[in-house]
Every structure is written in structure tokens, then in C-alpha cells.
Design a protein with these regions (language model features):
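Short loop/turn segments that connect beta-strands within beta-propeller blades
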Residues: 51-53, 102-105, 163
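Surface-exposed loop/turn positions within WD40 beta-propeller blades
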Residues: 43, 85, 94-95, 154
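Extracytoplasmic beta-rich repeat domains
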Residues: 13-31, 36-43, 61-82, 113-124
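A structural motif specific to WD40 beta-propellers
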Residues: 57-58, 107-110
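Short glycine/acidic-enriched loop and turn motifs that connect beta-strands
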Residues: 3-4, 95-96, 144-148
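Conserved beta-propeller blade signature
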Residues: 57, 87-90, 137-139
Length: 163
């Protein structure tokens, strides 16, 4: 038994090797502008929850529409990285940026441009110099999906030193 149906040009198809299944992946953008997901605002948020007290500590929209025309919060794929010093790092699906928030207050501490969208979960590592002093780094894979109206197809690994 096989089912056939029409799909749009923006759909990526992939055979599931060794099975009788296939994958169809597409972006879910509005049919009018073609750039906004079909959902209400904010489209993406970050929040911190105190699990012990079972309460939300803070919540805020994450990411801006290009050229800061709208501060709507944008969806993101990657997860956060939380350092032992209370810095919360996270990338953005549509923006080519890495963000750092204060985990206690939600204050945006830092943001930096990336060569492509920060779709991945950041990670951290430390390197010791010849004198035994450790320096901590945050690294993120920056890449995109060429089908995304705000993204680009690219492959980068970008590292930042934490001072």
C-alpha cells in the first residue's frame, strides 16, 4: 500500500534507509509574508524555573526581528548552556547571534554576531596554560537552513573566551 500526495517545493524529502518510510520536513511560515511562523507573539522565549520552589523566576522574549523592526522573540532550536558563574548562553534560530543572560535576573549581559544562525546548543570547555591557569571558552556551531527566509546555509564553529 502506498499513498501519494502533492507537496510544496519547500519540502525536503529523505528516505529512511532500511525501512519503508520517508521523512518530509518543511518550514511552517505564514503564507503571506513567508517569514513569520504561524503562531502568536512572542514566537520564542527563554525562562528560568526554580525547580525546588516550583516557580518561574523570569521569562522574556528571546531574539529580535531583523533590523529590530519588531521585538517579538524568535523561535530557537538549540538548548541553553548554564555556566557555574550564572551565565546563561543560548543561540537563535533566525538571528546570527549568541546571547548571554544573567540566570538570576534575566538581564541580557552580552550578544555577539555569528557568521550564520546559532541553531546549536552552546558548549563550554577550559584550557590550562603552561602555568596551570585555566581559561574557559564557550563554543557554538553556527549554520543554517537555506530554505529559511531569514537563515543561510553555512557551517562554522565559533569560540569565545570568557573573561
Amino acid at each position: 500500500y502506498r499513498a501519494f500526495f502533492n507537496i510544496g517545493d519547500d519540502v525536503e524529502l529523505g528516505v529512511q534507509a532500511g525501512t519503508s518510510y520517508a521523512m518530509a520536513r518543511h518550514t511552517m511560515f505564514d503564507p503571506y509574508l513567508g517569514v513569520l511562523p504561524c503562531a502568536g507573539f512572542p514566537l520564542g522565549e527563554v525562562m528560568v524555573i526554580d525547580i525546588n520552589e516550583q516557580r518561574q523566576l523570569w521569562r522574556r522574549p528571546h531574539g529580535d526581528f531583523p533590523a529590530k523592526v519588531l521585538s517579538i522573540g524568535l523561535p530557537h532550536n538549540g538548548g541553553p548552556l548554564l555556566t557555574s558563574t550564572g551565565i546563561f548562553f543560548i543561540g537563535s534560530l533566525f538571528e546570527s547571534k549568541l546571547y548571554a543572560y544573567d540566570v538570576d535576573s534575566g538581564e541580557l549581559l552580552w550578544q555577539h554576531a555569528l557568521p550564520a544562525p546559532g541553531n546549536a546548543t552552546p558548549m563550554s570547555y577550559a584550557v590550562k596554560d603552561s602555568e596551570g591557569n585555566a581559561k574557559q571558552f564557550v563554543v557554538i556551531a553556527a549554520g543554517g537552513d537555506a530554505r529559511s527566509p531569514l537563515g543561510s546555509s553555512a557551517d562554522y564553529i565559533v569560540a569565545f573566551a570568557i573573561e
